[in-house]
Amino acid sequence: MLNRVFLEGEIESSCWSVKKTGFLVTIKQMRFFGERLFTDYYVIYANGQLAYELEKHTKKYKTISIEGILRTYLERKSEIWKTTIEIVKIFNPKNEIVIDYKEI
């Protein structure tokens, strides 16, 4: 499956969606390419029970590791198509599965 993503990074910010149906987290990744430092930001989200687990994780840890699926959506204000990552699994710092969407 080409849309599966494994992502790890520092938690930059988090918030509930406007309608309180999902929890969003911005992840920051820093990496070197040669001697240049690059910083990338990714937005991940979860709905339902997984959203509450994601909120707990962001309060407890400063970093996060996830498995997710790429999702494309149309942002209504700007009418621009964007891509985000829907979380399927959350891992703790020891790489143990904390919560698996399939188990909920």
Swiss-Prot record:
It comes from the Bacteria. This is Uncharacterized protein MG376 homolog.
